[in-house]
């Protein structure tokens, strides 16, 4: 009992520390007592406002399952007000010079740097990942903001002078209007930062719906954007679940939707949003394979497999959840298990923690059930993390590193995205067999090959039907000057996130054919035939 009281007190202390730092905007420290918990605000037209909803969702610290806050399911009126604020702000923001919009983002990236550790602490409190991993979450999002500051180069149009005498042809990119983003729980800072900074620097206004499980980081990011000089109404934030998603998919004033999350939700949003005439980009699930050749650097490969499989407790869409050991590389399996055993499982804010808890008890149960299915279907559990107990955090959603071998492509633990600290291991005799396994899997988010042979690496990179390939790089998430190019069942849409494709998604082309005659003359008679542009 005493331990439980102490743990609860520690959680309250962390809430109050974070609250005071962010001026009690959405976690008002003064309202926290033994009978109440902080409430997350809405952000509408430049103001953080308390929701009038009668439906609220508890936010839990995954390490303790202690309630640390409550987030509203926004009412229809509140969601309408948020879109209306976006719509009102759009004309002036779109007409704001591109240099002025760039200056807002330049100030914004500096404020994110200055507040990076505070954002990371909020992430760890609500999501559970280690503080170091949470800082990486913020940093990878910050890189996209920094890239968005290059908008003056990214939004260049095209020209073709003198297509005929006195006639020029040119195009430029224009914002769409009101855009919306629906973010997942696993990257509370990075994914929102993939969305609204890119959209807004192009001249759009933005409606953001963070995950109801981890809203705090997005709210702090909104405050920092406001402090950077973004006009009221250019970014608005609502909260909720299914009703909020349907609202975004159906609202006629929303022109484009960015989504990251599960396949079930992504397919639904893509179909419903597209049916309503919206652009939709949806990053979804994955089953990322790491193919290990026997000539690979053994030390580096084993360390990279362990880090990429179990970091963030496997709750990454780019987690390396499947290892394919080719030929003699299968002899490395015992050493792989020993390295995974050495990882330290603890609450994310504890020193030395390598991985924290899963997001919810339901997520833990699902992961454990998938491990069970492997054993029942004939696989071997070489390392079992199902019964791990973390001292002082016995109520947390912890699963330790788990390695399942003798896995076949027909097994449930292989076919489903586990989204937990579980590595499934398959074995093949040849590279061609490994390539077939990867290509037969429906997902196409990421893959990696570990080898010291350049010809093998090139063959693999060219033959696998996967959008992002790493060569001795286990998690090949592109830097933002490129784009996140997941494919097949991992993505729906025509245009990917950030980079050049991100600019294309959030803009539309306008093409202008202009004629200014050299002589000051007028037509002597109407031209009634089809223009041939001088040909």
Curated annotation (Swiss-Prot):
Pfam families (alphabetical): Aldedh
Chief localisation class: mitochondrion
Residues with N6-succinyllysine modification: 47, 52, 55, 76, 117, 129, 364, 376, 391, 517
Biological process annotations from GO: beta-alanine catabolic process; brown fat cell differentiation; thymine catabolic process; thymine metabolic process; valine catabolic process; valine metabolic process
Residue numbers carrying N6-acetyllysine: 47, 52, 55, 76, 87, 117, 129, 298, 330-331, 364, 376, 500
E.C. no: 1.2.1.27
A GO cellular component annotation in the UniProt record: mitochondrion
Function field: Malonate and methylmalonate semialdehyde dehydrogenase involved in the catabolism of valine, thymine, and compounds catabolized by way of beta-alanine, including uracil and cytidine.
Annotated protein name in UniProt: Methylmalonate-semialdehyde/malonate-semialdehyde dehydrogenase [acylating], mitochondrial
């Amino acid at each position: 009992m005493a331990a439980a009281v102490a743990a609860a007190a520690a959680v309250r202390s962390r809430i109050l520390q974070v609250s005071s730092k962010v001026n009690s905007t959405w976690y008002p420290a003064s309202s926290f007592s033994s009978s109440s918990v902080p409430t997350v605000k809405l952000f509408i037209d430049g103001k953080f406002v308390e929701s009038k909803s009668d439906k609220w969702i508890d936010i839990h610290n995954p390490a303790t399952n202690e309630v640390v806050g409550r987030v509203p399911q926004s009412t229809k009126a509140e969601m309408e007000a948020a879109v209306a604020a976006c719509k009102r702000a759009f004309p002036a923001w779109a007409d704001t010079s591109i240099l002025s919009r760039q200056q807002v983002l330049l100030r914004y990236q500096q404020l994110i740097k200055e507040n990076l550790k505070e954002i990371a602490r909020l992430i760890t409190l609500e999501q559970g990942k280690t503080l170091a991993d949470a800082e990486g979450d913020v940093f990878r999002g910050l890189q996209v903001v920094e890239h968005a500051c290059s908008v003056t180069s990214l939004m260049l149009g095209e020209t073709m002078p003198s297509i005929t005498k006195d006639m020029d042809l040119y195009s430029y990119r224009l914002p769409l209007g009101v855009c919306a983003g629906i973010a997942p729980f696993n990257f509370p800072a990075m994914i929102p930062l993939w969305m609204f900074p890119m959209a807004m620097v192009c001249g759009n206004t933005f409606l953001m719906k963070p995950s109801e499980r981890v809203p705090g980081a997005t709210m702090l990011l909104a405050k920092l954007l406001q402090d950077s000089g973004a006009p009221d109404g250019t970014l608005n934030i609502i909260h909720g679940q299914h009703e909020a998603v349907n609202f975004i998919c159906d609202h006629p004033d929303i022109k484009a939707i960015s989504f990251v999350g599960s396949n079930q939700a992504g397919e639904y949003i893509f179909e419903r949003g597209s049916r309503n005439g919206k652009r939709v980009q949806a990053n979804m699930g994955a089953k990322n394979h790491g193919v290990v050749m026997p000539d690979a650097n053994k030390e580096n490969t084993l360390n990279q497999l362990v880090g990429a499989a179990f970091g963030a407790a496997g709750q990454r869409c780019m987690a390396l959840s499947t290892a394919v050991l080719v030929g003699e590389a299968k002899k490395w399996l015992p050493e792989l298990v020993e390295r995974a055993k050495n990882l330290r499982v603890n609450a994310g804010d504890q020193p030395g923690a390598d991985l924290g808890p899963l997001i919810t008890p339901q997520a833990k149960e699902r992961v454990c059930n998938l491990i069970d299915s492997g054993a029942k279907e004939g696989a071997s559990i070489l390392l079992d993390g199902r019964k791990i107990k973390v001292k002082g955090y016995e109520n947390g959603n912890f699963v330790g590193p788990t390695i399942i071998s003798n896995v076949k492509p027909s097994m449930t633990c292989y076919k489903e995205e586990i989204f937990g600290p579980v590595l499934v291991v398959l074995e093949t005799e040849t590279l061609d067999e490994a390539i077939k396994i990867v290509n037969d899997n429906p997902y196409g988010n990421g893959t990696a090959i570990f080898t010291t042979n350049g010809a093998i690496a090139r063959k693999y990179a060219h033959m696998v039907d996967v959008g992002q390939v790493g060569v001795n790089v286990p998690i090949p998430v592109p830097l933002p000057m490129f784009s996140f190019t997941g494919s097949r069942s991992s993505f729906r849409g025509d245009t990917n996130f950030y980079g050049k494709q991100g600019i294309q998604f959030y803009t539309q082309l306008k093409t202008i054919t202009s004629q200014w005659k050299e002589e000051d003359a007028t037509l002597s008679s109407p031209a009634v035939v089809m223009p041939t542009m001088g040909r």
